[in-house]
Swiss-Prot record:
One GO biological process term: translation
Gene3D superfamilies: Ribosomal protein S18
Organism (species): Mycoplasma mycoides subsp. mycoides SC (strain CCUG 32753 / NCTC 10114 / PG1)
InterPro entries: Ribosomal_bS18, Ribosomal_bS18_sf
Entry keyword annotation includes Ribosomal protein: yes
Protein role: Binds as a heterodimer with protein bS6 to the central domain of the 16S rRNA, where it helps stabilize the platform of the 30S subunit.
PANTHER family given in the database record: 30S RIBOSOMAL PROTEIN S18, SMALL RIBOSOMAL SUBUNIT PROTEIN BS18M
GO molecular function: small ribosomal subunit rRNA binding; structural constituent of ribosome
Listed name of the protein: Small ribosomal subunit protein bS18
Domain of life from the UniProt record: Bacteria
Record note on quaternary structure: Part of the 30S ribosomal subunit. Forms a tight heterodimer with protein bS6.
């Protein structure tokens, strides 16, 4: 019996692919792509973002939450 090996596809960095240099906290539609259904920021291993982009993304989401553009908890 042969065991099939599962190949993991490398995740593509969304921000480098679309040539986005600055993640704006006012761009709510973009930020919603990186938030889970219950309102948590998705980790790098799921989104495929680079460490630098993940830090900028988290900062932008936190700013949007403070400005009441995004909710803290989604019910």
């Amino acid at each position: 019996m042969q065991v099939k090996k599962i190949k993991k596809r490398k995740k593509v960095n969304f921000f480098q692919k679309n040539n986005i240099k600055y993640i704006d906290y006012k761009d709510i539609e973009l930020l919603k792509k990186f938030i889970s259904p219950n309102g948590q920021i998705l980790p790098r291993r799921i989104t495929g973002t680079s460490p630098k982009d993940q830090r900028q993304l988290a900062l932008a989401i936190k700013r949007a939450r403070q400005m009441a553009l995004l909710p803290y908890v989604i019910e």
